[in-house]
Protein backbone atom coordinates (compact mmCIF):
# COMPACT_ATOMS: atom_id res chain seq x y z
CA UNK A 1 0.00 0.00 0.00
CA UNK A 2 2.80 2.41 0.90
CA UNK A 3 4.63 1.67 -2.37
CA UNK A 4 1.44 2.29 -4.36
CA UNK A 5 0.78 5.55 -2.57
CA UNK A 6 4.29 6.90 -2.99
CA UNK A 7 4.49 5.88 -6.66
CA UNK A 8 1.08 7.39 -7.36
CA UNK A 9 1.85 10.67 -5.60
CA UNK A 10 5.07 11.11 -7.57
CA UNK A 11 3.63 9.98 -10.91
CA UNK A 12 0.57 12.27 -10.75
CA UNK A 13 2.94 15.25 -10.50
CA UNK A 14 4.24 14.44 -13.99
CA UNK A 15 1.15 12.84 -15.56
CA UNK A 16 -2.44 13.48 -14.48
CA UNK A 17 -3.25 9.80 -15.19
CA UNK A 18 -0.44 8.64 -12.88
CA UNK A 19 -2.87 7.44 -10.22
CA UNK A 20 -4.89 5.52 -12.80
CA UNK A 21 -1.74 3.92 -14.18
CA UNK A 22 -0.44 2.98 -10.72
CA UNK A 23 -3.78 1.41 -9.89
CA UNK A 24 -3.77 -0.41 -13.25
CA UNK A 25 -0.31 -1.86 -12.60
CA UNK A 26 -1.54 -3.14 -9.26
CA UNK A 27 -4.68 -4.61 -10.78
CA UNK A 28 -2.54 -6.22 -13.47
CA UNK A 29 -0.43 -7.94 -10.81
CA UNK A 30 -3.53 -9.64 -9.42
CA UNK A 31 -4.06 -11.51 -12.70
CA UNK A 32 -1.01 -13.79 -12.43
CA UNK A 33 -1.79 -14.18 -8.72
CA UNK A 34 -5.23 -15.58 -9.54
CA UNK A 35 -3.82 -17.88 -12.21
CA UNK A 36 -1.06 -19.14 -9.91
CA UNK A 37 -3.64 -19.85 -7.20
CA UNK A 38 -5.92 -21.61 -9.64
CA UNK A 39 -3.41 -23.76 -11.47
CA UNK A 40 -0.23 -23.77 -9.37
CA UNK A 41 0.67 -26.84 -7.37
CA UNK A 42 3.85 -25.91 -5.54
CA UNK A 43 4.88 -23.71 -2.64
CA UNK A 44 6.69 -21.51 -5.18
CA UNK A 45 3.36 -20.87 -6.91
CA UNK A 46 1.63 -20.03 -3.63
CA UNK A 47 4.39 -17.63 -2.55
CA UNK A 48 4.46 -16.04 -6.01
CA UNK A 49 0.70 -15.61 -5.94
CA UNK A 50 0.84 -14.08 -2.46
CA UNK A 51 3.53 -11.60 -3.51
CA UNK A 52 1.75 -10.61 -6.72
CA UNK A 53 -1.60 -10.27 -4.99
CA UNK A 54 -0.27 -8.46 -1.94
CA UNK A 55 1.73 -5.89 -3.88
CA UNK A 56 -0.84 -5.61 -6.66
CA UNK A 57 -3.90 -5.23 -4.48
CA UNK A 58 -2.06 -2.79 -2.25
CA UNK A 59 -1.19 -0.60 -5.23
CA UNK A 60 -4.76 -0.82 -6.51
CA UNK A 61 -6.46 -0.19 -3.18
CA UNK A 62 -4.19 2.70 -2.18
CA UNK A 63 -5.41 4.62 -5.21
CA UNK A 64 -9.18 4.08 -5.11
CA UNK A 65 -9.98 7.17 -3.04
CA UNK A 66 -7.37 9.42 -4.72
CA UNK A 67 -8.75 8.47 -8.15
CA UNK A 68 -12.28 9.08 -6.90
CA UNK A 69 -11.17 12.57 -5.81
CA UNK A 70 -10.10 13.29 -9.39
CA UNK A 71 -13.67 12.80 -10.62
CA UNK A 72 -16.06 13.57 -7.74
CA UNK A 73 -16.62 16.86 -5.91
CA UNK A 74 -15.94 16.92 -2.19
CA UNK A 75 -19.70 17.39 -1.66
CA UNK A 76 -20.37 13.85 -2.89
CA UNK A 77 -17.19 11.92 -2.09
CA UNK A 78 -18.52 10.08 0.96
CA UNK A 79 -21.52 8.88 -1.04
CA UNK A 80 -19.36 7.90 -4.00
CA UNK A 81 -16.92 6.03 -1.78
CA UNK A 82 -19.82 4.29 -0.06
CA UNK A 83 -21.14 3.12 -3.43
CA UNK A 84 -17.64 1.99 -4.39
CA UNK A 85 -17.26 -0.01 -1.18
CA UNK A 86 -20.77 -1.46 -1.41
CA UNK A 87 -20.04 -2.64 -4.95
CA UNK A 88 -16.81 -4.26 -3.80
CA UNK A 89 -18.52 -6.08 -0.93
CA UNK A 90 -21.29 -7.25 -3.26
CA UNK A 91 -18.79 -8.57 -5.79
CA UNK A 92 -16.88 -10.30 -3.01
CA UNK A 93 -20.06 -12.08 -1.93
CA UNK A 94 -20.75 -13.19 -5.51
CA UNK A 95 -17.18 -14.46 -5.93
CA UNK A 96 -17.44 -16.50 -2.74
CA UNK A 97 -20.57 -18.21 -4.01
CA UNK A 98 -19.12 -18.68 -7.49
CA UNK A 99 -15.86 -20.20 -6.26
CA UNK A 100 -17.82 -22.50 -3.96
CA UNK A 101 -19.70 -23.88 -6.96
CA UNK A 102 -16.47 -24.34 -8.92
CA UNK A 103 -14.89 -26.07 -5.93
CA UNK A 104 -17.87 -28.41 -5.52
CA UNK A 105 -17.56 -29.42 -9.18
CA UNK A 106 -13.78 -29.98 -8.87
CA UNK A 107 -12.85 -27.15 -11.25
CA UNK A 108 -11.66 -24.46 -8.84
CA UNK A 109 -8.79 -23.53 -11.16
CA UNK A 110 -11.31 -22.63 -13.85
CA UNK A 111 -13.06 -20.33 -11.38
CA UNK A 112 -9.81 -18.50 -10.66
CA UNK A 113 -9.13 -18.27 -14.41
CA UNK A 114 -12.58 -16.75 -14.92
CA UNK A 115 -11.84 -14.19 -12.21
CA UNK A 116 -8.51 -13.37 -13.86
CA UNK A 117 -10.40 -12.74 -17.11
CA UNK A 118 -12.87 -10.46 -15.34
CA UNK A 119 -9.99 -8.54 -13.75
CA UNK A 120 -8.41 -8.17 -17.21
CA UNK A 121 -11.64 -6.66 -18.55
CA UNK A 122 -11.81 -4.30 -15.54
CA UNK A 123 -8.18 -3.31 -16.17
CA UNK A 124 -8.90 -2.50 -19.82
CA UNK A 125 -11.99 -0.49 -18.86
CA UNK A 126 -9.98 1.41 -16.24
CA UNK A 127 -7.21 2.32 -18.67
CA UNK A 128 -9.61 3.18 -21.50
CA UNK A 129 -12.26 5.21 -19.71
CA UNK A 130 -10.71 6.86 -16.64
CA UNK A 131 -9.33 10.13 -17.99
CA UNK A 132 -8.94 12.62 -15.18
CA UNK A 133 -8.54 16.29 -16.02
CA UNK A 134 -7.44 17.49 -12.57
CA UNK A 135 -5.79 16.04 -9.48
CA UNK A 136 -8.57 17.26 -7.15
CA UNK A 137 -12.02 17.81 -8.67
CA UNK A 138 -13.78 20.98 -7.49
CA UNK A 139 -17.28 22.22 -8.37
CA UNK A 140 -17.26 25.66 -9.92
Range-by-range predicted roles:
Residues 59-72:
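Intracellular juxtamembrane helix-capping segments at the cytosolic ends
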Residues 31-39, 115-140:
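Multi-pass alpha-helical transporter architecture, strongest
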Residues 29, 52, 84-91, 121:
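Small/hydrophobic positions within alpha-helical transmembrane segments
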Residues 1, 71-105:
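A late C-terminal transmembrane helix in Major Facilitator Superfamily
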Residues 43-59:
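Hydrophobic core of transmembrane alpha-helices in multi-pass small-molecule transporters
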Residues 7-8, 12, 99-107:
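Interfacial helix-cap and linker-helix signal at transmembrane-aqueous boundaries
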Amino acid sequence: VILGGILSDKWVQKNIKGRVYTSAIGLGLTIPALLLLGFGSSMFNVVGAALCFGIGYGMFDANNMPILCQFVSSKYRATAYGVLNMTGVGCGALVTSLLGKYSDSGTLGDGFALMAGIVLVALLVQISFLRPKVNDFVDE
